[in-house]
Amino acid sequence: FGGWKKSSIGPGLKPGGPNHLSGYGNWTEQNINIDAAIADYKDQWNSYFTQEHDPTGLKSEANILRYFPIDKVFVRCSDPTAPEIDLMRTASALTGVPLEISVRSDESEAALGNRMQRSSGDVRLRVLAPTTDELLSLAHASGITVDTAPVTGSGRLELTHWIKEQAISRTMHRYGRLLNQP
């Protein structure tokens, strides 16, 4: 699929693309090395997510992938000082996506739901703390993607939660004959 619209559902990884399968499971890590994770986030952002690329390498068709930051991420957590929150702040700074932190002990689910309802665009709720169906229903009613994946130290995995992926396809042949490309 090329383009945007409704062909990109949920977290925004295009079907058939190199990042698509990572959304079908959860990656977890024990004892994330924060310094190494931050370095990897920066490396992956600069070398992968800010570059247009064609992983197929076909001569007859270009399938260019490019990435755009989403509009906002809410995170529901129990401990705002947890290392995972520091990594989310790093991802937010790199991608330019605003991060709004909601601490369970400080904000009710209804209050967070009200804040989410006032948001617009491509917004995600990252759930890192136990929650109820009430909050999930509020997010769903607002058209917000709920993301329950744990934060990882892998920039390639983590930064996909902060972007939407666009595929641009271009035919480079005519009746089976390759066209001269500039």
Q: Where are the regions that the model predicts?
A:
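C-terminal segments
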Residues: 1-182
